[in-house]
Design a protein with these regions (language model features):
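Peripheral interaction segments used for macromolecular assembly
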Residues: 2-11, 15-138
Length: 138
């Protein structure tokens, strides 16, 4: 699942490549430069998410993409300890704000941990290769 998530996020972040100069090479498109505003997959995947008061409220577990590669949903793991008892919830991808703090990616969401804990839970279904409602989450 981590590989699929990283691949999906790589595709997502690569959509800004339209701004870069492109050189055609057969069926592939090679780039002679990359957009200076581009962000890496690791700026998002497995990164902490904070509320407006700088309290950690969760961690990015996955990003879901539209067929055109546009990100639409972020799965955030909230609660639990070392993964045990954690609940995965879905939020609109564009509701997460990305900035830099101390030269590191800093993700914020305009909500609090309790709101995320009370949101509907999701679980990854490997047979469908996507996230589905988790009717057993609290």
């Amino acid at each position: 699942m981590k590989t699929a998530a990283l691949l999906s996020l790589s595709i997502l972040l690569g959509t800004g490549a339209a701004y870069a100069q492109q050189v055609s090479a057969g069926r592939s498109e090679l780039m002679s430069s990359v957009p200076q505003t581009s962000r890496t997959v690791t700026d998002w995947y497995k990164q902490n998410v904070y509320d407006p008061n700088d309290n950690k409220i969760g961690e990015i577990m996955d990003v879901l993409l539209e067929p055109n590669g546009q990100a639409n949903t972020a799965i955030i793991g909230v609660g639990g300890f070392l993964g045990a008892g954690e609940k995965d919830v879905a939020v609109k991808f564009d509701s997460i704000k990305s900035t830099m703090k101390d030269n590191k990616p800093y993700l914020t969401l305009d909500t609090n941990k309790d709101a995320l804990k009370n949101a509907p839970g999701f679980k990854y279904d490997s047979s469908k290769t996507t996230w589905v409602p988790d009717n057993n989450s609290k």
